[in-house]
Structure formats: structure tokens, C-alpha cells
A protein has these predicted regions:
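N-terminal amphipathic/basic leader segments beginning at the initiator methionine
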Residues: 1-24
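Mg2+-dependent prenyl diphosphate-binding active-site environment of isoprenoid biosynthetic enzymes
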Residues: 14-15, 24-221
């Protein structure tokens, strides 16, 4: 089972790496340094946990590989943008990410800020180019934008920043992690299903329960 999972995981990661390279602007296209920073942030690193969740649930619902690859790429761009901004001196002030200098160290703070902004925008360009049902497209937009906003990743990061020097309760800590990390993990699960169809109420409840458990497991391991 472990071996078959590893094979599947490597297959998805390889597929996604190619798709991301294709969907990101070329380094040779003006503004070159911005595009270089975007590609630096996204390519050749990371476990691709969120795209794997898109593919796992999407496969269960019979989604096309081409649609899952597009949706998963949008999710990974949102994740990469959040890491760029989180690493900056005004946030967590990290100098290393995935064993290499963070984007603001490599390209400067201003270019890092722009690269993050551009990746967030590019994610929705990618999502808009999925050529299928219009209702599904709107649902996917709602899910991904909600996970990235003030009731998702941004909200979780705001709570994290506000908590510096304070003792958080278990409830506050859970809320921070649920928003900062769990929101995009949950979105990845839901977007996998929405790569194929709109889930039934029963399927929706099951997916949400699974996403909640997966998010908690991720936090424990992380």
C-alpha cells in the first residue's frame, strides 16, 4: 500500500511540476525579474500536499486529470503566494524556505511583495481557464477566494501576529490553525470534488469531516 501510494504521489507531483511550469509566465517575458521571482517561489520544491488532496478527492469523484491539474496549480499558487508574504520581515522574517533563500532574501522585499501579489492573481487566471460548467467555475472561485481571505489564511496570519507575546487559549490556537493552514487544506479537498461535480449534501458533509481531520493531522505532524 505504501509503495503504491508513493508511486501515485510521485506521479501527481511530476504532473503538477510540468503544469505549473507551463502556467507560470516565462522568465524571458517582461518584467523578467518579477517572473523569475514567481517561478523561484513555486517550482522545484515542496511536498505539494494541497494539490495531492485535489487529485485524491477529484479522482474519487471521477474528475478529468486535465481539470484537476489546472485546479491544483491554482491552489499551489495561492499557497506559494502566502509563503512569500509570511516569510517577509514584517511577518515571520524567515530567511530560508525549502533549503534555499526565501524570495525576499533572493530578490528583495519589494519584488517579493509583487511576486506574491502576482501569484495570487495568476491563480485566479488559471482557475478561470478551466473550460467546463459555469456553475462549477463560480463554486471553485468562491471556495478558493474564501480560503485565502480574512476568514481563511489572511485571518489566521492576523491572529498569529496579534498573539505575539500573549498566551493563547486552546480555542484561540485551534482557530488560528484552522484559518491559517486548515482553510486551504479544506479548500483543496472541496476543489477536488468540484473538479468533477457539485457534491450532494451527504458527500459535502463527509468531505468537510475528512478535511477537518486531515488538517488536524497535518498540524500535529507539522
Amino acid at each position: 500500500m505504501t509503495e503504491s501510494f508513493d508511486i501515485w504521489m510521485r506521479s501527481v507531483q511530476s504532473c503538477l511540476e510540468k503544469k505549473l511550469s507551463e502556467l507560470l509566465p516565462s522568465e524571458n517575458r517582461t518584467p523578467q525579474r518579477l517572473h523569475e521571482a514567481m517561478r523561484y517561489a513555486v517550482l522545484d520544491g515542496g511536498k505539494r500536499i494541497r494539490p495531492l488532496l485535489v487529485f485524491a478527492t477529484g479522482t474519487l469523484f471521477g474528475a478529468k486529470t486535465s481539470v484537476m491539474a489546472q485546479v491544483a496549480s491554482a491552489v499551489e499558487m495561492i499557497h506559494a503566494y502566502s509563503l512569500i508574504h509570511d516569510d517577509m520581515p514584517c511577518m515571520d522574517n524567515d530567511v530560508l524556505r525549502r533549503g534555499k533563500p526565501t524570495v525576499h532574501v533572493q530578490f528583495g522585499e519589494a519584488m517579493a511583495l509583487l511576486a506574491g501579489d502576482a501569484l495570487q492573481a495568476q491563480a485566479f487566471v488559471v482557475l478561470s481557464n478551466v473550460n467546463d460548467d459555469a456553475v462549477l467555475a463560480v463554486k471553485r472561485y468562491q471556495i478558493l477566494s474564501g480560503a485565502a481571505g480574512s476568514l481563511g489564511m489572511c485571518g489566521g496570519q492576523a491572529i498569529d501576529l496579534d498573539s505575539i507575546g500573549k498566551q493563547l487559549t486552546i480555542g484561540q490556537l485551534e482557530q488560528m490553525h484552522r484559518l491559517k493552514t486548515g482553510a486551504l487544506l479544506k479548500a483543496s479537498v472541496m476543489l477536488g470534488a468540484l473538479s468533477a461535480k457539485i457534491p450532494s449534501p451527504e458527500e459535502n458533509r463527509a468531505l468537510e469531516e475528512y478535511a477537518k481531520a486531515a488538517g488536524l493531522a497535518f498540524q500535529v505532524i507539522d
